[in-house]
Design a protein with these regions (language model features):
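Acidic, metal/ion-coordinating pockets
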Residues: 1-170
């Protein structure tokens, strides 16, 4: 899809046409969650299988469609190592204030939690992955994923977040 977006955009990536059929659909919902299956950033060249990197322009399109909640923890989270995690986190941090991400956790504390209040309802979000395609937590990484088999960390995160939200989405 990024190759088509580059062809359409010329000197930039234009993802709008790929999602044109969905324009307006998500307006009917108060909360729109998307599992972002690849690292998003402009530090690494766009790449597909087997080590993915998606151009940052995708988030403009997704934002304009109405997505505000993005899960970042998945099997491709470590595709570009610690630098990929940092680049992706920096990209998401530059998004508008109403964007919420979860899935990359501080590896020392695992307590950088994501909350969002919509129509007076506070949502808490957690995101996990089953595996990272055989890639270990990158050396030197400050942030990383929590694996589904890490029941102790997951239980602690759920217990920490429950009192602070009306709805907890895991």
């Amino acid at each position: 899809i990024f190759l088509q977006a580059k062809e359409r955009g010329g000197d930039h990536y234009d993802f709008d046409a790929a999602y044109a059929a969905m324009q307006g659909y998500y307006d009917q919902f108060d909360v729109n969650w998307l599992n972002q299956e690849t690292l998003v950033n402009d530090e690494f060249a766009a790449s597909g299988y087997p080590m993915f990197s998606t151009p940052g322009a995708i988030t403009d399109t997704l934002y304009n469609l109405g997505f505000r909640v993005f899960s970042l923890s998945n099997n491709h989270s470590y595709d570009k190592g610690a630098a990929g995690i940092e680049a992706s986190m920096a990209h998401w941090a530059a998004m508008p204030d109403d964007v919420v991400t979860m899935g990359f956790y501080n590896l020392s504390t695992y307590d950088n939690y994501a909350y969002q209040t919509v129509n007076g309802i506070t949502f808490g979000y957690l995101s996990y992955t089953e595996h990272t395609n055989g890639l270990p937590t990158p050396s030197g990484a400050e942030y990383g994923v929590v694996y589904l088999d890490d029941r102790e960390t997951i239980a602690k995160q759920i217990a920490d977040m429950r009192p602070n939200c009306d709805v907890l989405i895991v």
